[in-house]
């Protein structure tokens, strides 16, 4: 029986690469996107052509209601065996003093709150089955940082 994974931020970059690896291993993949619809649909078609079930699911993980709906839609493919949180955005390259409250909240909303909301939504599915894995991913910004002062 095939396994099922939900990958947030899966339309491009690290998320898309992660989706390709899971699909190559035979996993069915739910690809979350927020703005990159065409890229997500193209990736779903690419993965499906390789013999796995792949679906593109729109949702802003920084919104708890959308994160809940996203997990439920992904679970309709089959029991979720894994969640991989790749969704992330970054501040523009600017001085910290030029960063607006809105910019800061948006980044924290996606990069921090989004991880919490999707994990919280998927946990009941995994606890009920007494199995499942959650992986959180960061880009190199999480290691190298940047100068903003």
Give the predicted meaning of each segment.
Residues 25-42:
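Conserved glycine-rich Rossmann-like NAD(P)H-binding loop of the short-chain dehydrogenase/reductase
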Residues 37, 58-70, 101:
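The beta1-alpha1 cofactor-binding region of Rossmann-like NAD(H)/NADP(H)-dependent oxidoreductases
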Residues 86-92:
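Conserved NAD(P)H cofactor-binding loop of Rossmann-fold oxidoreductase domains
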Residues 94-96, 103-105:
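Substrate-binding pocket helix/loop in short-chain dehydrogenase/reductase
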Residues 119-120:
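A short, exposed helix-loop element centered on a Lys and neighboring polar residues
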């Amino acid at each position: 029986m095939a396994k099922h994974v939900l990958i947030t931020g899966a339309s491009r970059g690290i998320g898309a690469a992660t989706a390709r690896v899971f699909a190559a291993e035979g996993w069915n993949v739910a690809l979350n996107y927020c703005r990159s619809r065409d890229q997500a649909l193209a990736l779903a078609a690419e993965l499906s052509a390789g013999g796995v079930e792949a679906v593109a699911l729109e949702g802003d993980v920084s919104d708890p209601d959308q994160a809940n709906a996203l997990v439920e839609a992904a679970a309709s493919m089959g029991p979720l065996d894994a969640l991989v949180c790749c969704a992330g955005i970054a501040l523009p390259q600017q001085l910290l003093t030029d960063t607006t409250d809105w910019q800061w909240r948006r980044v924290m909303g996606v990069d921090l709150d989004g991880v919490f909301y999707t994990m919280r939504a998927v946990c009941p599915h995994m606890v009920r089955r007494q199995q499942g894995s959650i992986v959180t991913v960061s880009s190199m910004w999480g290691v190298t940082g940047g100068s903003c002062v």
